Amino acid sequence: MPDFISAKIMKKNYKGEVFPCMGCRSFLAPWKDEEGNYKWYGRFNQGVVTINLADVGLSAEQDMEKFWNILDERLSLCREALMLRHESLKGTLSDVSPIHWQFGAIARLRPGETIDKLLEGGYSTLSLGYIGLYECVLSLLGKSHTTEDGDELAVRIMERLRGACD
């Protein structure tokens, strides 16, 4: 399936810049270099963890309090997994993949230099993915996320995911 982007909106939001998503339809968060220019290419995602919202919704058995508790537990697990990935990358030497870390595919580090400075400050990202929002809302409310009640719940769920990432 092709990825569709809105070049018109991107140009408006990012000072005329348009950029593609990564292979999994994941976009890097905006990041500017020391001169204030957006940098999209050469950056990377340290890892992604996907939360299965359909499973969270079904596990709650239509109990909203139980749902929010399960969701928070799963989000905590996702955060732990992402931070384990982040910590495991610390200390990685540029020598493990010179084409990436030394010759410019991602950076131009010296031989023997760690990639640590690329792991902080937004140059690279950690991502929380999700799947099954429709099924989650349907299992909790018995209605689609396209109904007024369903839309309200779907937005609250997305806000909770966003809050977990901030």
Enumerate the language-model features and the residues they cover.
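Conserved catalytic cores of very large enzyme subunits
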Residues: 1-122, 139, 143-166
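Contiguous, well-ordered alpha-helical segments that form the cores/surfaces of helical PPI scaffolds
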Residues: 126-139, 159
